[in-house]
Amino acid sequence: RSNETDGNDYYFVSVSEFKNLINQDKFLEYAKVFQNYYGSSKDVVFKKLNNAENIIFDIDWQGTQQIKSQKLNYKIITIFILPPSRNELYNRLLNRDRNDEKIAKERMIQFNEDVLHWRDYDFVVINDDLENCYKKIIKFIKFSQEKMDPNYQRLISSHVESLIN
């Protein structure tokens, strides 16, 4: 898309360079989507994780499965974002892709497959209102972080012990 910039939205490389990076196992996940290759660099991801940064991936269910299959020593929270309706999704795709009906129709066909995988995610949110969707996502993240907190785990463990004794 014309509004995307190299090094900000994506790192743009040639197809041959991308395939070379695949062969070198440089991606945590990758896919070819509508004639374009997309991937998440292991080096970039692990550098951020080693700096205790949280990472948000905007990827499809196949990319999510690739990351989950890596058995990383990091907590992964998966959130599937649904549109409020098929019609609204189509309109959003048209607006995003400069009213290119061909692209919007191709993406709607792909959506028919993608939506079947919603159960594979930890959380699901309907993006009918951007602000509400954002608040729900933050709530899911905070809930997951609380569950991972060792102090919280000790508190729950202690409480369970008191209930069974």
Located regions from the model:
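Conserved catalytic network of the ASCE P-loop NTPase/AAA+ motor domain
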Residues: N3, K47-N50, S69-Y74, L116-W118
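NTP-dependent small-molecule kinase module
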Residues: R98, E113-N165
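Conserved AAA+ ATPase "sensor/coupling" helix adjacent to the nucleotide-binding pocket
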Residues: Q24-L28, R92-N99, K139-F143
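Ras-like small GTPase catalytic G-domain
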Residues: Y74, R86-L89, L94-L116, E131-N132
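Alpha-helical elements of Rossmann-like donor-binding domains used by nucleotide-donor carbohydrate transfer enzymes
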Residues: V44, Q66, Q110, K136-F140
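Switch/connector loops and helix/strand junctions flanking conserved nucleotide-binding motifs
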Residues: R1-N3, T64-I67, R86-R92, N132-K136
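Conserved phosphate-donor/acceptor-positioning beta-strand/loop module used by diverse small-molecule
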Residues: I55-W61, K71-R96, I126-N127
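ATP-dependent small-molecule kinase phosphotransfer cores
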Residues: R1-I55, W61-Q65
